[in-house]
A protein has these predicted regions:
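Short, charge-rich amphipathic alpha-helical segments embedded
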Residues: 30-46
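Structural signature of tandem alpha-helical TPR/SEL1-like repeats
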Residues: 15-29, 50-63, 85-97, 119-131
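Residue-level recognition of tetratricopeptide repeat
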Residues: 11-12, 46, 80, 114
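Helix-start (N-cap) detector for alpha-helical repeat units in TPR-like alpha-solenoids
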Residues: 3-4, 38-39, 72-73, 106-107
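Amphipathic alpha-helical repeat scaffolds of TPR domains
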Residues: 1-12
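Terminal, low-structured helical/coil segments at or just beyond the last alpha-helical repeat
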Residues: 110-140
Length: 140
């Protein structure tokens, strides 16, 4: 109950005040009340990622994935982070899983394509990009 309130306050720190430090303090408070609160781990990870604190962000996403291996947001955001820090194999594994968990997510297919291109899999990358493009066309 209270952990959720701190999560919401953390989200407001980002959306209203653009204050990442205050947001992280609220996510930490939520996690002190409920260490298994996956949404708080993910939001903290995203906030750290956006602040370019990649090591700490990856630790948050790793915790979230270990708590719930089939959580799309946890797997997708860790894959996105791994692509950013050039852990291409890790990114490929996560983004492949993310596209399986949520096949309708265009962004996951696009990033999966980007990761595949980095290891020279141009044909597979093009397939993922085409899927992303088709999904975006459907939405508009």
């Amino acid at each position: 109950q209270y952990a959720h309130e701190y999560l919401l306050m953390g989200n407001e720190c980002i959306t209203q005040a653009h204050d990442a430090r205050a947001a992280i303090a609220n996510y930490d408070k939520a996690l002190s009340l409920d260490p298994n609160y996956i949404d708080a781990w993910i939001r903290k990870g995203i906030t750290l990622f956006n602040s370019k604190e990649y090591f700490d962000a990856e630790n948050c996403f790793n915790t979230a994935v270990s708590l719930h291996p089939a959580n799309f947001k946890a797997v997708y955001n860790r894959g996105k982070l791994r692509l950013k820090i050039d852990n291409t194999e890790g990114a490929i594994a996560d983004l492949d899983k993310a596209t399986s968990l949520k096949p309708e997510h265009a962004g996951a297919h696009e990033l999966f394509g980007d990761a595949l291109l980095r290891v020279g899999k141009e044909v597979e990358a093009a397939i993922q990009w085409r899927i992303a493009e088709e999904l975006r066309k459907k939405k508009s």
